[in-house]
């Protein structure tokens, strides 16, 4: 998948900002004490009123009270290159670990752009920056003046092979196809040699401007290589085209593997087997999807909910690799042109990796990489620092109750720069609960990461808690909530990045800039529901 240059011209935040500012102010939320029926304990701060209810602007544009300095940390969980951004990821595992090739994107791309760079890891919290792998073409006459997504494999001949997209915006003016499939080889996965004679273009009934993202693998049953390509068929629309080869040089066109006749393109296709099912991942319109089948030949069908993370470039172009017996889904979370919580995500940003979980019915879920339990080893579970609204604590369970015009909140002090928050949450009716971020005791200006039982979703909009019922989310993902049912939550934060996992089923990858820019306190909240938060634990990495 290629980033189009028009992305550099987009500015996103106006509509959501206006929506945040234009709602009627709800009644003031009242203060309450937080009795503990098991023991009399100090809560570390006096209860304070939920102030700031006259504020109508979004949280990140409101004035922060009691601002405290936040000291950031290096990105160890969600890497990106210095002075650049991570674009489409092309994962491949070998005896040296998980090799994470990616499109290297900058804000100052020249005529040529998107070389392939690489990170590598064996534990998902220590990444080695291996630098440049394949450079784009050196002249406007070369088909890979820009490079698009591809794949890397260690083939039957013992060599490493990279198939990638050649993209040249000037070619259509010369009567040539804009995109093609190109081939490079390496003996050591360090030095690469391009093979120009292996370059090939789209078949006649496929668009020459949309022929990209080659994915190559060895099919043991057929004793040949399969090549999947994101293509646009003149009759079927977006398809996953299929080719076969015995030598990785000459390719034979076969019938499409998947043609749902829904999207214009099915970018970044990725096919693998897990258990009794085959899974096909693809991306379009800022979202990563998957389909599944009992056979590698299909037919592939979308499950009822085939999105594992959020919308809007918060997790895109994801492809998979198996490493040490587990399958990982590797994509990127977009950056924003301005660090505003209400702003939209742009193309390319930070690498995000989820571990895939197979459910009993064959559908997939996601969780954090299991190895992170070796990273978050120090308990830093905090005490309550303050509350607002109807909050009670009983034997380690926080019960928050609020009406439609109220917010209940328990605040736990300053967040850790890198932290794992784990708990279970239940909601008794169709309302809102979740995790709040703000400046000290200025609770009226807190913003929230929302578990939305009314609309069956998890989302973030960057506005004050009293506005969450009225504002369109910046990003969201579907999740069905049942009244009274407990859900297991893990929230991993590293600087402004916050990735929430729920029940090993869904993730929402997100950037909460306000949580590192003055509003560095965190808490839990409820609105128009009674919510119970149990077994809250916070862990951080060991000091280095």
Regions found by a protein language model. Give the residues of each.
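C-terminal motif of bacterial Sec signal peptides marking the signal peptidase cleavage site
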Residues: 16-19
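Secretory/extracellular carbohydrate-interaction modules
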Residues: 401-463
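Short tryptophan-centered beta-strand motifs in secreted/extracellular beta-sheet-rich domains
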Residues: 271, 421-423, 485-502
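Beta-rich carbohydrate-recognition and catalytic domains
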Residues: 21-23, 27, 47, 52-213, ...
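Beta-strand-rich interaction surfaces with strong enrichment in secreted/lumenal proteins
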Residues: 407-414, 475-481, 522-523
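Extracellular beta-strand elements of beta-rich domains used
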Residues: 534-538
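Short, aromatic/His-centered strand-loop micro-motif at the edge of beta-sheets
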Residues: 466-488
């Amino acid at each position: 998948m290629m980033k189009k240059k028009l992305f550099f011209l987009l500015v996103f935040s106006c509509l959501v900002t206006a929506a945040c500012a234009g709602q009627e102010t709800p009644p003031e939320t009242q203060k309450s004490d937080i009795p503990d029926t098991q023991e009399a304990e100090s809560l570390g701060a006096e209860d304070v009123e939920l102030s700031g209810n006259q504020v109508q602007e979004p949280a990140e544009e409101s004035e922060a009270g009691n601002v405290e300095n936040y000291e950031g940390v290096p990105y160890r969980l969600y890497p990106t290159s210095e002075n650049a951004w991570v674009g489409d990821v092309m994962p491949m595992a070998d005896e040296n670990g998980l090799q994470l090739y990616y499109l290297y994107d900058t804000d100052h791309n020249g005529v040529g752009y998107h070389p392939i760079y690489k990170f590598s890891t064996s534990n998902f919290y220590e990444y080695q920056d291996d630098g440049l792998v394949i450079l784009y073409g050196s002249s406007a006459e070369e088909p890979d003046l820009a490079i698009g997504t591809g794949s890397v494999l260690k083939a039957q001949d013992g060599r490493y092979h990279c198939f990638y997209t050649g993209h040249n915006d000037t070619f259509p003016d010369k009567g040539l196809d804009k995109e093609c499939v190109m081939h490079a080889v390496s003996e050591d996965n360090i030095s690469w040699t391009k093979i120009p004679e292996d370059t090939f273009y789209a078949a006649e009934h496929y668009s020459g401007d949309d022929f990209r993202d080659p994915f190559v693998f060895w099919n043991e049953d057929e004793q040949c290589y399969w090549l999947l390509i994101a293509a646009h068929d003149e009759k079927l629309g977006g398809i996953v085209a299929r080719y076969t080869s015995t030598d990785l040089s000459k390719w034979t066109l076969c019938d499409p593997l998947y043609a749902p006749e829904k999207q214009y393109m099915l970018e970044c296709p990725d096919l693998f087997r897990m258990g009794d099912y085959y899974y096909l991942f693809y991306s379009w319109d800022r979202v990563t999807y998957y389909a599944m089948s009992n056979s590698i030949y299909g037919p592939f069908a979308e499950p009822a909910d085939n999105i594992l993370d959020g919308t809007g470039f918060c997790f895109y172009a994801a492809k998979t690799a198996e490493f040490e017996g587990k399958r990982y889904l590797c994509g990127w979370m977009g950056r924003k042109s301005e660090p505003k919580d209400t702003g939209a995500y742009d193309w390319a940003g930070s690498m995000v990796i989820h571990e895939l979980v197979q459910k009993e019915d064959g559908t997939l879920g996601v969780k954090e990489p299991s190895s992170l339990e070796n990273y978050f080893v120090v308990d830093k579970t905090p005490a309550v620092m303050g509350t607002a609204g109807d909050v009670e604590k009983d034997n380690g369970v926080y019960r928050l109750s609020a009406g439609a015009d109220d917010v209940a909140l328990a605040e736990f002090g300053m967040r850790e720069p890198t932290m794992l928050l784990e708990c279970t949450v239940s909601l008794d009716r169709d309302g809102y609960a979740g995790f709040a971020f703000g400046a000290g005791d200025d609770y009226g200006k807190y913003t929230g990461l929302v578990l939305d039982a009314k609309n069956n979703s998890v989302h973030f909009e960057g506005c004050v808690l009293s506005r969450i019922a009225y504002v369109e989310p910046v990003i969201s993902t579907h999740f069905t909530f049942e009244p009274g049912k407990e859900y297991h939550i893990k929230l991993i934060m590293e600087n402004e990045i916050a990735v929430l996992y729920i029940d090993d089923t869904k993730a929402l990858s997100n950037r909460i800039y306000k949580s590192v820019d003055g509003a560095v306190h965190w808490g839990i909240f409820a609105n128009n529901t009674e919510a119970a938060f149990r077994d809250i634990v916070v862990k951080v990495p060991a000091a280095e």
